């Protein structure tokens, strides 16, 4: 009704317009427009939105926002797409993982665990030269995982296109069907990242990657179990982790 008033037409005209655009109704059109605007918000605009949060309620607001993102991701995620991503990764000769800017921690997390599960995992580096040097080697027997959320990293999208042109399968981890990753990926896994500030909410994407890693580990159970036993021996021999009884932990605080 408010949109009709603003543009000087009736509510029924707005509904017919939404239907003519291919939407089931105005609410669906409204949601699509909101998503489009959200993707285009600059960091400063996102920060201004955060100013509406009361300072004494920041903790609860942000945590509730992250919980909502995880819940919505759980409800919306396609099990079929998730299963297909698992199969593509299991069939790959080599796996390339790429995520830049705020998505870099997600890509690093995924790459770390994929290297425990698979022998051939390449983390595509962040410098311009190294990015294209790595991606140029991708072949039709490989799989690339591109991770990016608003505002999308141009180089990630470009490298996904190169991988696709080289015949590789491409998996996108992003926020929705309007993402540029959806255009190039063979399969996309969507996670909600609605933010309460200029900071990207990575709670749902991280949970999604957790699920992907666990699914892969269960399919490679025997190989992974043997590798972890060998690694534990090396880790213990070289003191990779601080032991609970290590004096470096210090005395417990009263």
PLM region descriptions:
Residues 2-80:
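HTH-adjacent hinge/linker in prokaryotic transcriptional regulators
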Residues 32, 36, 88, 231:
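Short acidic/histidine-centered micro-motifs embedded in hydrophobic/aromatic stretches
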Residues 80-87:
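A short, basic/flexible loop-to-alpha-helix module at the beginning of a structural domain
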Residues 87-208, 213-220:
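Glycine-rich phosphate-binding loops that contact phosphosugars or nucleotide phosphates
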Residues 222-254:
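A short, charged, Gly/Pro-tolerant segment at domain boundaries
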């Amino acid at each position: 009704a408010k949109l009709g008033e603003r543009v000087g037409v009736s509510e029924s005209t707005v509904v017919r317009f939404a239907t003519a655009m291919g939407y089931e109704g105005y609410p669906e059109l409204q949601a699509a427009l909101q998503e489009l605007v959200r993707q285009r918000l600059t960091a400063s605009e996102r920060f201004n939105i955060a100013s509406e949060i009361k300072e004494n309620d920041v903790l609860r607001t942000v945590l509730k926002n992250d919980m909502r993102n995880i819940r919505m991701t759980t409800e919306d995620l396609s099990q079929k797409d998730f299963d297909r991503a698992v199969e593509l990764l299991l069939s790959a000769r080599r796996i390339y993982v790429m995520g830049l800017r705020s998505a870099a921690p997600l890509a690093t997390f995924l790459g770390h665990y994929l290297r425990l599960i698979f022998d051939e995992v390449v983390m595509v580096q962040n410098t311009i030269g190294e990015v294209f040097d790595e991606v140029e080697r991708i072949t039709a027997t490989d799989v690339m995982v591109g991770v990016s959320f608003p505002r999308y990293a141009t180089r990630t999208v470009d490298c996904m296109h190169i991988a696709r042109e080289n015949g590789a399968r491409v998996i996108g981890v992003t926020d929705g069907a309007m993402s540029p990753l959806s255009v190039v990926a063979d399969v996309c896994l969507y996670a909600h990242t609605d933010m309460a500030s200029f900071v990207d909410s990575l709670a749902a994407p991280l949970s999604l990657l957790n699920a992907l890693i666990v699914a892969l580990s269960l399919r490679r159970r025997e190989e992974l179990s043997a590798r972890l036993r060998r690694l534990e021996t090396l880790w213990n021999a070289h003191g990779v982790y601080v032991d609970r009884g290590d004096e470096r932990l210090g005395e417990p605080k009263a």
